[in-house]
Amino acid sequence: NTLRWGVSGQAELISDHISEWEWRDSAGYSLPNDGQTMELYYAMRGDSSMKSARVQAYIQNEHKWNTASGQWIFTIGGRLQWWSWNNEVLPSPRASVEWLPGWKRDFCFRLATGLYYQAPFYKELRDTVTDALGITRIVLNRDLKAQRSVRVVLGGDYYFRAWGRPFKLTAEAYYKYIDRMESYTVDNVRVRYSGKNDSQGYGAGLDLKLYGELVPGADSWISFSTMVARQRPINGGAWIPSPTESRYNFSMLFQDYLPQLPQLKFHLKMLFAEGQPYYAPRNSQAWGRMPMYKRIDLGATYIFNAQTAKFMRAASAKHVKQWAIQFEVFNLVGWKNVN
């Protein structure tokens, strides 16, 4: 048996000021237009502060069991969280089993499940109310609960050799259901949360990844993922894509070096993915999808250590194992992407 445990705590002190407004102007009038006054289309104000404390603890026990069918590894444990802001206690039990079959030690299969909580941080607490003047004001929601999800992951690894080189193929299928979910929208680099447990959602997908050393000492890999992630209001309504949904993703990393100069490594990275959803301002039910994201990067890394650089063997550098200089060209082809 292997038993692990830990406890941590932190204190938080946050002060926040927000002032936003939107004015829609046209030739001779602004929107909204009543013919007499100039009105803002949207305005938000907020001055808030928060003091809170968090305590977290975890315990995990791992047991290995050898049988005629192979080696079994059972892991069971859990996390416990408490936050002074809403006085919520969050127990999170988890378990997994891993099997290394006796008939083929190059395989490994695993199954994991658990109840997970994502405790909110300050930005997620910001609820809104609209006053008589039409100004939206920030209020902190003390009744906001942690988002809760049930997850199941089934996966496996296969170790093999091809062309005289080691490879590893990893596959994982997953599903999660989320309730007490807090909806949010993404506007460029701004993430705006609703401040309420107003949604539910689910996600499911498949991840495939092949690792290999095409040249000794330099890892390369290729991966493909497909997934679906949907959410809807908790009181019903249409399922819409979650802001991070990308239904397919293909990526690759290839590394190589000169045999006469192994400390100089070159790498090529490729990424092709479906564009993520976008939404109309302050209306998440009206949405579209960005074009496909595609990029190729090329780079080089030079590693300095005691074997490759004389100055690294000096007494002044005895506490430094190695350091590196990296040069990289992003988006080598110059494709135009929407972000």
Label every PLM stretch briefly.
Residues 49-55, 89-91, 148-152, 175, ...:
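Residues that define the transmembrane beta-barrel architecture of outer-membrane proteins
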Residues 272-279, 302-339:
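C-terminal beta-signal and adjacent terminal beta-strands/loops
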Residues 1-86, 170-173, 221:
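Face-selective signature of the C-terminal outer-membrane beta-barrel domain
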Residues 65-69, 174-177, 196-278:
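Gram-negative outer-membrane beta-barrel transporters
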Residues 1-2, 65-72, 101-107, 161-167, ...:
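Short loop/turn motifs that connect adjacent beta-strands in outer-membrane beta-barrel proteins
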Residues 102, 143-202, 325-330:
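Membrane-embedded beta-barrel scaffold of Gram-negative outer-membrane proteins
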Residues 1, 9, 57-63, 95-99, ...:
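Residues on the lipid-exposed face of transmembrane beta-strands in outer-membrane beta-barrel proteins
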Residues 5-11, 76-80, 97, 111-115, ...:
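Transmembrane beta-barrel strands of outer-membrane/channel proteins
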